[in-house]
């Protein structure tokens, strides 16, 4: 009934395993064969007609010998046959034989079997000959009163189609259907009848709706959906009707059908901007997300909530629903949780942040009690980051959050613990009043930390922010506890010597004799020569890291000990205590150096770590004021500067987002008076039903269409030359998951070209959906052929092929014109995206495909080259603008993008300007691209190479 329902296809499976039969054999089967033979013959006739055969001699045979049969399969096949068979003479007059067929239609419309009646009515919807339909009108009208709903609903469809195409055949159709609708009880029949009134006589549809508006909630969901559509269209065209129908939309929010609730909520938002309407719609969306089990539905509805939030006035209403939105976190799907947390974070305000933090704390504790799973770890990370953001925006909440989160520093999941550590580092720097609490909790969990990266970070925080003698002593105590007895080498050797003795006293069990390859006997000891693992488990954490050969943590330990020792010297007045503390710190460093150079660790200490520890020993032995300032002031100043820059960037990005959302009102814009406000509001909105229909049909307007200077002609690809007998050019229309080729084919000859076929093939991750149908081109005629290509991933695809045709009257072989290749631009599938530095590094380490592109350009400015690459690749620069600003001879930047298929693409730009070659020297260097798939890495590299060459020329 809508634009999408105007076309109805019947799909027929064609087998190519046999030769096409002759007309004589088909005629014999149709005349004298059994039911089965007639069925097969009729199928073959249908396929041959679809392939372009005329078969005029079989029409009367089928009317005489097949049409009278009552077999249901044959009746179904006959409906297909009558649909495709030519019904007119070359001059457009109806064939005489069709009068007999018309009588058969009439009998089928009066058949006692409801299926035959209903399917015949459906078939009549496809007829385009009014002469055939006119004698059938009384029988079609009578079907409206049939006892079976299948017949009645198809009768409504038939009447609507006939009224739309040939109004003179049934001029009273709207009145007839209105009367039918008033008395009808079946939901599907009422839906079809109401749908017809919407399109044929909207006033009658509104009159009917007005009479039963209070009973709408009792209707079936299919009728409710149509009512929602009608109300939307009426109010969109005539805003003054909103007050009349908005209560009905409110009632439909309580429908038992999720589809009706979803459509009603969307309609309510477009019809009214009142806070009560927005709140009701948002509440409906939230209930749908919670109750629906399909994660795709949850994500779609979440997107609608996010769209609501983009409107400044709606955002204030949604802020009161943050706690309801958090109920969605009961969904186990990570993507749903991620979107929910982001939405809640965007909406949180000082009024509800406390409640939000309480809920998130409970969720964090829950993740600790759940069986470990990959998604559980990622969810915990999301929660930690959300709490981190809340604490930065609302400092009063930090004191409640920190104790809970710091328990996770001892977590085995390094990623979650690293997020907690980053949060703690920022909190201890920003909030002076929380430092004692953070130090206390850090000292509590310090011994339980299991991963070396987290241990290093915790050491740094303790060394940087312990400012009292008691805290400094506590740090030293924890370090000694974590290191075990010192000197480490002597202690380990003693343990080794002590463990050998009891093993010698153990009575060896009788060992079985084994035969070697050489035929000699060998005995197997019952004692294991490898070190028992329990001893390794019993080692204190820091000693365990050192014995594993990780001496980077030793360098971090040396820096921490230097900081606390210098601070202790400044705080303690007793010279003996000062010397004692410094000596203890130096002893620990010396014993670590000794261990690193011994053969006990799995890996020896590196030269860099030796230099760092030696430097710290020298600083402590000399205690100069300059070194004191560097260790105790400059380090903290660097952190403070980094956090300030990051905060400034976040504020800048938030400002840009808010500017995007705010509707700018120009000084010369017309003023909307009260009487005109509603109309003005509605006029600015597009028809949502039309937009969704276009999206479903793949006709959405892409972003380039928003530019008035942009033209489809920019994407036209010439496929053949002007001197070829057939000229062809294609417009490449890229949708989300498919490509539509709109090919213009022009016959440049004076001959008629028969069976002109566009033959296409693909290279890459592309797949041709269906082969274009052959056509006939008159001399100098033209036609448009459309072909659909399915896209499965972001790779550079190539479409190639040719046009083949026969010349009318010529006896030669088929002619062929080879087409130029069509290269599919992957930029249509790549979108800029953001990720944190930690996520970027993690993906960089995980992705196995790398493509290194050498810079080859004539651009002489580093920033200009970077901007050119960003524009060419559609990627986003993750490196802050401040880090890239200034005049420098080199530049390094990280770029990131995601495809619509969820594929990640990373790039690292490392470029320099060779000073010795002069001011006009071009930029050189390289770009490293990493991706999970080889195709993505290669495609992006090709794109960069092509754009460089274009610039260079």
UniProtKB/Swiss-Prot annotation:
* PANTHER family according to UniProt: COATOMER SUBUNIT BETA
Q: How does it assemble?
A: Oligomeric complex that consists of at least the alpha, beta, beta', gamma, delta, epsilon and zeta subunits.
Q: What does this protein do?
A: The coatomer is a cytosolic protein complex that binds to dilysine motifs and reversibly associates with Golgi non-clathrin-coated vesicles, which further mediate biosynthetic protein transport from the ER, via the Golgi up to the trans Golgi network. Coatomer complex is required for budding from Golgi membranes, and is essential for the retrograde Golgi-to-ER transport of dilysine-tagged proteins.
- The record's HEAT repeats, renumbered to this chain, cover 96-131, 132-168, 240-276, 277-314, 316-353, 396-433
Identification of the protein by name? Coatomer subunit beta
Q: How does it sit in the membrane?
A: Peripheral membrane protein
State the GO CC annotations: COPI vesicle coat; Golgi membrane
**GO molecular function term, any single one:** structural molecule activity
Q: What happens when the protein's gene is inactivated?
A: From 28 hours post-fertilization (hpf) onward, embryos show an anterior-posterior gradient of pigmentation defects. While the head is fully pigmented, more posterior regions are decreasingly pigmented until midtrunk levels, where pigmentation is not detectable. Melanophores are present at midtrunk levels and migrate correctly, but are not properly pigmented. Embryos show severe reduction in pigmentation and widespread degeneration from 48 hpf onward. Failure to form perinotochordal basement membrane (PBM), without the loss of laminin immunoreactivity.
Protein's gene: copb1
Keywords tagged on the record: Cytoplasm, Cytoplasmic vesicle, ER-Golgi transport, Golgi apparatus, Membrane, Protein transport, Repeat, Transport
Query: Sorted alphabetically, which SUPFAM superfamilies does this protein's record hold?
Result: ARM repeat
């Amino acid at each position: 009934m809508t634009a999408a329902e105007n076309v109805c296809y019947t799909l027929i499976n064609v087998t190519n395993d046999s030769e096409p039969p002759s007309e004589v054999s088909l005629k014999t089967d149709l005349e004298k064969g059994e039911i089965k033979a007639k069925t097969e013959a009729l199928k073959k006739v249908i396929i041959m007609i679809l392939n372009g055969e005329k078969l005029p001699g079989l029409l009367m045979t089928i009317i005489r010998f097949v049409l009278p049969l009552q077999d249901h399969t044959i009746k179904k096949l006959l409906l297909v046959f009558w649909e495709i068979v030519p019904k007119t003479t070359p001059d457009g007059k109806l064939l005489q034989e069709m009068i007999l067929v018309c009588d058969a239609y009439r009998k089928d419309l009066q058949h006692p079997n409801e299926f035959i009646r209903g399917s015949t009515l459906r078939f009549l919807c496809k007829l385009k000959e009014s002469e055939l339909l006119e004698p059938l009108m009384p029988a079609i009208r009578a079907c409206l009163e049939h006892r079976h709903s299948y017949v009645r609903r198809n009768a409504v469809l038939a009447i609507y189609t006939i009224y739309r195409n040939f109004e003179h055949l049934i001029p009273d159709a709207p009145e007839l259907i209105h009367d039918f609708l008033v008395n009808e009880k079946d939901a599907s029949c009422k839906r079809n009848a109401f749908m017809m009134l919407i399109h044929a006589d909207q006033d009658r549809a509104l009159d009917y709706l007005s009479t039963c508006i209070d009973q709408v909630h009792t209707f079936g969901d299919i009728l409710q959906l149509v009512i929602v559509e009608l109300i939307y269209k009426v109010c969109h065209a005539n805003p003054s009707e909103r007050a009349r129908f908005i209560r009905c939309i409110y009632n439909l929010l309580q429908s038992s059908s999720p589809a009706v609730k979803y459509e009603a909520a969307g309609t309510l938002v477009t019809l009214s901007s009142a806070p009560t309407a927005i709140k009701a719609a948002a509440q409906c969306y939230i209930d749908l997300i919670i109750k629906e089990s399909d994660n795709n539905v949850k994500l779609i509805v979440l997107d609608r909530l996010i769209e609501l939030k983009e409107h400044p006035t709606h955002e204030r209403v949604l802020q009161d629903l943050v706690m309801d939105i958090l109920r969605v976190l009961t969904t186990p799907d990570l993507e749903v949780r991620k979107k929910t947390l982001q939405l809640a974070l965007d909406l949180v305000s000082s009024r509800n942040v406390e409640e939000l933090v309480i809920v998130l704390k409970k969720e964090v504790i829950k993740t600790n009690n759940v069986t470990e799973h990959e998604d559980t770890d990622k969810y915990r990370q999301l929660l930690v980051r959300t709490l981190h953001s809340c604490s930065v925006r609302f400092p009063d909440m930090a004191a409640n959050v920190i104790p809970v989160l710091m328990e996770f520093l001892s977590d085995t999941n390094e990623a979650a613990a690293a997020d907690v550590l980053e949060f703690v580092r920022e909190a201890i720097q920003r909030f002076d009043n929380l430092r004692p609490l953070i130090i206390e909790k850090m000292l509590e969990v310090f011994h339980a930390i299991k991963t070396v990266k987290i241990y290093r970070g915790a050491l740094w925080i303790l060394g940087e922010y312990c400012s009292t003698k008691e805290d400094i002593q506590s740090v030293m105590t924890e370090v000694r506890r974590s290191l075990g007895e010192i000197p480490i080498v002597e202690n380990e050797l003693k343990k080794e010597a002590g463990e050998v003795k009891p093993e010698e006293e153990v009575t060896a069990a009788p060992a079985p004799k084994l035969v070697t390859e050489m035929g000699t006997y060998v005995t197997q000891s019952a004692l294991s020569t490898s070190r028992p693992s329990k001893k390794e488990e019993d080692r204190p954490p820091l000693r365990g890291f050192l014995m594993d050969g990780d001496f980077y943590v030793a360098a971090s330990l040396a820096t921490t000990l230097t900081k606390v020792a210098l601070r202790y010297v400044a705080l303690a007045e007793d010279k003996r205590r000062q010397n004692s503390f410094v000596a203890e710190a130096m002893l620990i460093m010396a014993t670590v150096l000794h261990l690193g150079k011994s053969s006990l660790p799995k890996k020896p200490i590196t030269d860099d770590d030796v230099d760092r520890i030696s430097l710290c020993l020298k600083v402590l032995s000399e205690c100069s004021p300059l070194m004191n300032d560097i260790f105790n002031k400059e380090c903290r100043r660097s952190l403070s500067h980094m956090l300030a820059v990051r905060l400034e960037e976040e504020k800048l990005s938030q400002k840009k987002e808010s500017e995007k959302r705010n509707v700018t009102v120009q000084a010369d814009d017309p003023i909307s008076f009260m009487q005109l406000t509603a109309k003005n509001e509605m006029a600015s909105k597009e028809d949502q039903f039309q937009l969704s229909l276009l999206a479903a049909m793949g006709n959405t307007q892409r972003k380039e269409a928003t530019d008035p200077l942009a033209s489809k002609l920019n994407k036209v690809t010439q496929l053949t030359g002007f001197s070829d007998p057939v000229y062809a050019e294609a417009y490449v229309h890229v949708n989300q998951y498919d490509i539509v080729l709109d090919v213009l084919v022009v016959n440049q000859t004076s001959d008629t070209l028969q069976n002109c076929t566009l033959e296409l093939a693909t290279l890459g991750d592309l797949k041709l959906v269906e082969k274009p149908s052959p056509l006939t081109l008159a001399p100098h005629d033209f036609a448009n052929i459309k072909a659909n290509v399915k896209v499965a991933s972001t790779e550079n695809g190539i479409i190639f092929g040719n046009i083949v045709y026969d010349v009318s009257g010529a006896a030669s072989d088929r002619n062929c014109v080879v087409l130029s290749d069509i290269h599919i631009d992957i930029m249509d599938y790549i979108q800029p995206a953001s990720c944190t530095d930690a996520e970027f590094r993690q993906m960089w380490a995980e992705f196995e495909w790398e493509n290194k592109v050498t810079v080859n350009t004539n651009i002489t400015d580093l920033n200009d080259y970077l901007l050119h690459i960003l524009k060419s690749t559609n990627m986003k620069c993750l490196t802050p603008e401040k880090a890239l600003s200034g005049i420098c001879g080199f530049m390094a930047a990280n770029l990131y993008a995601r495809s619509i298929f969820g594929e990640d693409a990373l790039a690292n730009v490392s470029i320099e300007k060779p000073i010795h070659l002069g001011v006009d020297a071009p930029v050189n260097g390289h770009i490293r691209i990493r991706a999970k798939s080889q195709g993505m890495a290669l495609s992006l590299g090709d794109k960069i190479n092509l754009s460089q060459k274009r610039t260079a020329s």
